[in-house]
Each structure stands twice: as structure tokens, then as C-alpha cells.
Amino acid sequence: MKGVYFVSGIDTDIGKTVATGVLAKQLLQQGKSVITQKPVQTGCQNIADDIAVHRKIMGIPMQEADKRRLTMPEIFSYPASPHLAARLDGRALDLDKIRTATQELAAQYEVVLVEGAGGLMVPLTENLLTIDYIRQQGYPVILVTSGRLGSINHTLLSFAALKQYGIRLHSLVFNHIHDSRDAHIAQDSLSYLKCRLKADFSEAEWMELAKTDAV
């Protein structure tokens, strides 16, 4: 892996933050120079909570890029989608600021993992969806899914959106976080999605994230 990758999820609370941290940790262990970025963090004041989680999982302290806010260029106080959080905070989301920060990180690190807010269709502004931004920047996507009820539907909808927008899927990460809810559904979801990934995105990688991987 080399370059900038956008980490998205099929839904909220799918384990995207943990997955991003674990992937970064694995890349560090492989000798890669890697950093994570949360371009838009909502529900916070000063420090992006997700970046703090990434650093803890990676086993490293906050970096100079964190202190300079390159990894968390836009923070809004209200816990909502970016377009609403920005409106409630009374200021516009600065896309140029985000782009510049990501470019600076990409110049310093071999791999930049950009964790989005929610799923592909989350609005960044009133007129721009997350998937629009991904396409504009040309980022390949790492999509996080799980075995909870509804994941097959949400994953296939995400597949369809990526195809429609002409965005490359780098990998599908199956997070075992929800396996305990229903083992039958979890196992069937895993088997089904693994087959669909091979059929729909033959060049994409299949990854699995165990509950213990973040420890």
C-alpha cells in the first residue's frame, strides 16, 4: 500500500475508527510510514476523539501532525453529519483546508488513511456528498462492514454507489464486532459478502478484523 486511502463504512457504529487504527498499526508493523486523518470530526471541541483512538491502537503518542491539526483540520461541536454540525456551529466547512492538510500528510508519509464521517452518502455540505469528495480526489476506498442484520443490504448498496461513481474499492474489511448478536447471521453475512466481493470487485482485497485486534 502507498498513497491516500479513504476509509468509509456501510453505516454508523460499524467499527470504522477501530478498523482504521488497526490497519495503521499493521502497516507500522510492516515498516511503513503511516498516519491517519479524520478530516471532519463532529461532537468534539479541541481534539478529534477518533484520532486519539487511532494513536492508542497504533501504540504511538500524538504526532506533530496532530498538534498542527493536519490530521483533524475541521472539528465541530455538535454530534451530527458534517453539513448539519457546521450549520449549527455557524460556520462553513472548509474543503480547501481539508485538501491541503491531506496533501501535506501525503508528502510526509507513505500511507495516509483518511477516516470519513459515517457512510459514503453522508453530506459534507448542503451540495456535496462524501462520495462526491472521494471521486473528486481520486481516492481508493477501504469499506468497513460487519455481520449484523442489515449489513448485506448496506454493503451491496455501497458497492452499487462505488460502481456508479467509478470509484475503486481497495478492500472490504469485515469487522467481527457484531458476531455475538447472532452467530448464524454473522457467518452467513461473511460467506455471502466474501463471494459478492470476488464477483463485483475481483481486484479488491478481503480483510477481517477480530474483536481482539484493537487490543
Curated annotation (Swiss-Prot):
Homodimer. Mg(2+) binds at T17, D50, E115. Its EC number is 6.3.3.3. The keyword Magnesium applies. It is an enzyme of class 6 (ligase). GO terms for biological process: biotin biosynthetic process. SUPFAM superfamilies: P-loop containing nucleoside triphosphate hydrolases (SSF52540). This is ATP-dependent dethiobiotin synthetase BioD. One of its GO terms (molecular function) is magnesium ion binding. Its main location: cytoplasm. Gene3D superfamilies: P-loop containing nucleotide triphosphate hydrolases (3.40.50.300). It catalyses: (7R,8S)-7,8-diammoniononanoate + CO2 + ATP = (4R,5S)-dethiobiotin + ADP + phosphate + 3 H(+). ATP binds at D13, I14, G15, K16, T17, V18, D50, E115, G116, A117, G118, N175, H176. GO terms for cellular component: cytosol. It holds the Pfam family AAA_26. Its cofactor is Mg(2+). Substrate binds at T42. The active site is at K38. Keywords: ATP-binding, Biotin biosynthesis, Cytoplasm, Ligase, Magnesium, Metal-binding, Nucleotide-binding. It is found in: Cytoplasm. Pathway: Cofactor biosynthesis; biotin biosynthesis; biotin from 7,8-diaminononanoate: step 1/2. Belongs to the dethiobiotin synthetase family. Catalyzes a mechanistically unusual reaction, the ATP-dependent insertion of CO2 between the N7 and N8 nitrogen atoms of 7,8-diaminopelargonic acid (DAPA, also called 7,8-diammoniononanoate) to form a ureido ring.
